[in-house]
Amino acid sequence: MTKNIHKHRILILDFGSQYTQLLARRVREIGVYCELWAWDVTEAQIREFNPSGIILSGSPESTIENGSPRAPDYVFTAGVPVLGVCYGMQTMAIQLGGKVESSNQREFGYAQVEIKADSALIRDIKDAINPAGEAVLDVWMSHGDKVAEIPADFVTVASTDTCPFAIMANEEKRFYGVQFHPEVTHTKQGLRLLERFVLGICGCEALWTSATIIEDAIVRLREQIGDDHVILGLSGGVDSSVTAMLLHRAIGKRLTCVFVDNGLLRLNEADQVLEMFGDKFGLNIVHVAAEDRFLSALAGVDEPEAKRKIIGRVFVELFDEEACKQEQVKWLAQGTIYPDVIESAASATGKAHVIKSHHNVGGLPKEMKLGLVEPLKELFKDEVRKIGLELGLPYDMLYRHPFPGPGLGVRVLGEVKKEYCDLLRRADAIFIEELHKADLYNKVSQAFTVFLPVRSVGVMGDGRKYDWVVSLRAVETVDFMTAHWAHLPYDFLGRVSNRIINEVNGISRVVYDISGKPPATIEWE
């Protein structure tokens, strides 16, 4: 009998903070299932979800502006603990009779809050003791408004010099507000505070672990699929790979994986995928060698968005053709993950909403009438990786840098040709190999090589050469929304450049991209 890993659950109401998904990931790290819903969720939806506790997120909005979002009134009458974070604390204060005002001195960044009263939320949690004998917490603030008056029956738990109510609490109703962000790592005791709320105050059990998620997924997959057959597009990326391993464990040979080699993959990648999933793990794989078909479709096309659409269209056509040959197949599996679901709902409604099936099948023919299987749709990317490790996939594969869906199709600038792809593959492999050798690969967030369709004069021995240019790109980022170019050592860059020019016949010059995001994007196309 498997445990009900959804038995205890936290509802996070999203007011639009850039940290909201991070907040959800922290709750999951603690071992408790949670979902992100829009702030204007209905009472009926909350009752149906039946949360053990509710967290109100931060927001870029101001609570003192007309029309700014508010939590549903039912949040405060549902009888469950509530934690308001930053904006969430401010809307809690206003809705329960307190006051919020614009702060003369805004707080962005590090702050130290002084504990003024005992509270179940932070009891025995501290970073230091100040000269006055008060416990203090090192926290991360990001607010322009502040609570000026707390509601009746609340007490001041902590404050700063400029923020009189950094933590407020109503212990009887188990309502808590924190003006800082416990979900970010800069708040040193943030995870302990969230643990105290989720496990201690809400009474949740830590049932959400990699092992229990796998066990639960296998049971649910077997119930959903029965004795039917499933087809999956296997790319070798993290999401499709973990989906394949979960399904293989659940239904074995009744899973057919279609691997489309589009000629736009990294060096030896197709062989590695086939060897790992076919030879090592024994999955049933249909290998579609389609380099010529993709390159023919891309001939003469140099506009990035047009290239992306062509690559997507040809993939769908090929996948359709193979799927139609599998007459016994009744289900299509996809590696949809929870951020895809949130993004899909946000694009449809303008905000994140209750979890719904995320159909990104694209152009699959209607006559296929396949059911949809999405075993990862409740999981964040970091959870998917941990599950992959538990299922036996290698660390290096699960934690390698992101690779775009269109592959080298958007790393060869302009028209895509086989010659360009072959040169780029070899140059990129040298760059990545040297990053590993120098122990730099895991110190940058993403690194790759770009092929530039321009020729440059070079000298080799006594001869003159006129060959192609490539650019190295390496960035450091937390969320890929913004990024800094990585300050790689000069001697390292020199070594990579020398190897590429000497070993890859056809490349005469190597440059290094020192553009941040913004203004540049991480990928060139």
From Swiss-Prot:
Pathway: Purine metabolism; GMP biosynthesis; GMP from XMP (L-Gln route): step 1/1
Domain GMPS ATP-PPase: 208-400
EC number: 6.3.5.2
A GO term, aspect molecular function: ATP binding
Cross-referenced Pfam families: GATase, GMP_synt_C, NAD_synthase
Catalyzed chemical reaction(s): XMP + L-glutamine + ATP + H2O = GMP + L-glutamate + AMP + diphosphate + 2 H(+)
The keyword Cell membrane is assigned to this record: no
Annotated residues for binding of ATP: 235-241
Free-text function comment from the UniProt entry: Catalyzes the synthesis of GMP from XMP.
Subunit structure: Homodimer.
Full protein name: GMP synthase [glutamine-hydrolyzing]
Organism per entry: Yersinia pseudotuberculosis serotype O:3 (strain YPIII)
